[in-house]
Amino acid sequence: MNSTALAVLLVRGKLPQYEPWRIVFSDTGEERPETYAYMRDHFEPWLAKHGKTLEVVRPDETILERWERLKVTGSRLLRGCTVEGKIKPIERHVAANGGGVQLIGVDAGEAHRMPDRVRPLVDLDIDREGCEAIIKAEGLPSPGKSGCWCCPFMRVGEVIRLAKVDPCKFERIARLEDIATETHGPQPNGQPRTQWGDKPASYWRERAGQGDIFYDEGRLSDDSPHCGCYDG
């Protein structure tokens, strides 16, 4: 959402101080299917109409491949997936292209995030609603939430929906939890290692079978902030 609004401002010449600029998408390899569809069907054609192209960078391995190689579940504290899957690929790309200033799509409602980065939306006091208005005025549909389909910060309803509509992906996480527990032992509290909150995949699988509760959007943990790349 925010990055799309920032791109609109750049394309429309509202941020001339950053000319010339390039738009780079850091693809973790595990983005939500809806994100890939939006980029393909809306964002990239819109950029092309304005004579711009989207540059895509990727890590050497997807974040899930990395977890599987290390035999660990995603960490809600270390946030290594953001660093390895998002930040490092972009930093390598920028360095390989002669360096430059990185503009981050953080809005004014998230001013506490990445205070050491250049954040035009924060500087212009544009919040999430403002971003939505900018995108709508441009004639683009809302990109919706972004983030990885396996993100440890997913909301309750999102985890249950994954178990319902894409059981193959869900079971991949279930296997990862089992392997992580077998390899590294249980958590300090004696419970198995988990990807989403303090409940194992079996719990979410059971809830998914109890009926349509897609609209349960509570957070997995009230004291656990979102990661740096999950826009939910």
What does each of the following model-derived ranges do?
Residues 1-232:
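Nucleotide-activated chemistry modules centered on ATP-dependent adenylation/adenylyltransferase
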